[in-house]
Amino acid sequence: MIVKTKKILIDSKLECSSGEALESFELMTDFYGELNEKKDNAVLVCHAFSGSHHAAGKRGDSVGWWDEFIGPDKTIDTNRFFVASVNNLGSCFGSSGPLSEDKNGEKFNNDFPQLEIIDWVESQKMLADKLGIEKWHLVIGGSLGGMQSLQWAVSYPKMVKKVGILAAAAKTSSQNIALNEVEREVIKKDGDFHDGKYLEFNKSPVKGLKAARMLGHITYLSAKNMDQRFGRKLQSTDSKIAEDVNFEIENYLQYKGGKFAELFDANSYILLTKVMDKFDIAQGYEDNLEAVLENVSAEMLVVSFTSDWMFPASNGKEICLASIKANKKCSYIELEGEYGHDSFLYPNEGYQNALKNFIESK
């Protein structure tokens, strides 16, 4: 598989929904496969909340977050398709964000423009223009990436042939907004946060970020999977992360939260949770989802998982039902999924076959 990683400069102004603007910006992007002469085999893969451009392939000890799905003869066959995977603006894996420098050569910190999903789509559209891609064969993503896919179908109906919306929703629920607010507050209460200017003090609020991620990670799992995997098993003494840990599930969350805090940026975390909170595709349409979808021309596939309590199956059904009422072509698949919200990330023969058939159908 041909893999290229590039940091691409978009030397044009991005007017953000907040009223702020970026005069130029960079998008860290992975490319898999080759773009054909007609440039009609392009696929855009949108990552979830804390994901990155590294969707496939192995780099050192790191394997792409959708490696089982992208590659030669895989679900998204790179013998046929050219895949672009973009690190979202505001994230911390190479694209412009709080860790980047502003026009004065200073780190943005928490002064990076507040973004919305529609801004991400606009930045990706500018990338497509630069690549000479007039129409994506497919835009696909899970969770926050699925929301981007839906926004693409609405914002640029003539630029998308197919859309895959996985474990996502048309708007963020009040429950998710509440959880995100708690996570933000935990980060801000860390003594090393310094009102978001921690880099100026050579600090990082790792304790707060760790705790926030531990809370967030619980929402990605399912009660059934947690019971099957951990139950009430006690953690062995020789592998305890902390002295006061008793159960395996505690140790697991301590480990996951700690590793995450080593890799992620707290200001990005806060910014991205707000991006999620602000998403409501029917805002400005009197909450009429059917009306929003009137101009969509892409064929849609919506996949939900019954074990997902972050974006439950009812969210996916809502999107597909509104699409059908708007006389759009939409298929809906509901799977149990072993891993709760994260089920969209894991290989499953029936799930992958459904995606592959959708992607390759004419």
Write out the residue ranges for each language-model feature.
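Alpha/beta-hydrolase-fold enzymes
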Residues: 165-259
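N-terminal cap/lid subdomain of alpha/beta-hydrolase-fold enzymes
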Residues: 30, 34-102
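Catalytic-loop region of hydrolases
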Residues: 1-45, 59
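Cap/lid segment of the alpha/beta-hydrolase catalytic domain
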Residues: 63, 74-128, 177, 181-199
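Conserved hydrolase catalytic core segment
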Residues: 135-175
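Catalytic active-site module of serine/aspartate enzymes centered on a nucleophile-bearing elbow/loop
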Residues: 318, 324-362
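Short beta-strand/loop motif that positions the catalytic acidic residue
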Residues: 296, 302-304
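Conserved alpha/beta-hydrolase "acid-adjacent" motif
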Residues: 309-315
